Amino acid sequence: MMPLALSAQHTFSIVAIDSITGEIGSAGATCGDSIIWPGTPGAILISDVIPGIGAIHTQSYYTENNQLNAHNRMLAGDSPEEIINWLVANDVSSNPSIRQYGIIDFNNGSPRSAGFTGENCFDYKNHVLGLNYAIQGNILLGQQIIDSMESGFNNTSGCLSDKLMGAMQGANVVGADTRCMSEGTSSLSAFLRVAKPGDDPNAIFIDLNIAGTPQGIEPLDELLIKYNNWKNNNNYDCSTQGIIESLDESETILIYPNPAGNIIYIQRNGIPLSKIEISDLTGKTILNQNISEPKTTLEIEVGHLKNGEYFITSFAQGSLVSNNKFTISSNN
């Protein structure tokens, strides 16, 4: 059998991790389905979730061998950034400029994300990274689709699956994939998947797929219906859960100044902070500092860092208490 390769693009998707529960998630949609691509299950084709380890989306001119190579590199212990670097250097068609990738891994509870958007992917194209997620898309209506997905993920309360659905509903706009403008929908097929640690990769906790819909029927609406039915049938209510446990108002984390220059302050009104980690947008750890005498206010030297955006993760008594983003704008 010849390896499967699709000249079609896959558009908007997200991979994400709950660092507390160890759940790993994957969701996406495209203006292609099992009818346009006979013998395929639709957009879910791009999803590779490895329970307890991470998730990979290989999209835009999907090629099965690129996906398999990424899978094997993750099993070998490569970080998301290392996997992408390897894929770019070893593209099966020697043409990484047409590919798009989003990768996340659990990394013992300190998630790492990485993305890649080739210059020859169809516009509009982009990706955005968070500490525990990667969102990517091509042939989009515009940056607003990526932004709305990110907002939907970050602002939806509940567990990982709820937040993934929030991200997907953020793209529930006619023509989100511009090829579907004439259909009056965002896409033609969609999926949402979540694996718990220890799941069989072929039988993960949540595995929902809309392989295709009749003309004019919105796949993201159908996916939401299917998800709500799944929750009802399984008596699953995670509305009070959260990827990071909510802090009491008395334990708010303050980071200032932001944007920062040479010094940044981290303040917590509660149990003193015992450790902080700073990472760049690829998930690479820049600073990992244990606090010998835990304090409620930390002064961190960041003058050696280049201008740009960074993530800072704060710990107290060995537990993660906050993930925040900050900007450095005045260093050379």
Model-assigned labels for residue ranges:
Residues 1-10, 311, 330-332:
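Bacterial Sec-dependent N-terminal signal peptides
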Residues 1-2, 169, 197, 248, ...:
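Residue-level marker of positions within ordered structural domains that often coincide
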Residues 2, 16-19, 277, 302:
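N-terminal hydrophobic or amphipathic segments with adjacent small-residue motifs
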Residues 9-240:
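N-terminal nucleophile
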Residues 246-332:
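C-terminal outer-membrane/trafficking sorting elements
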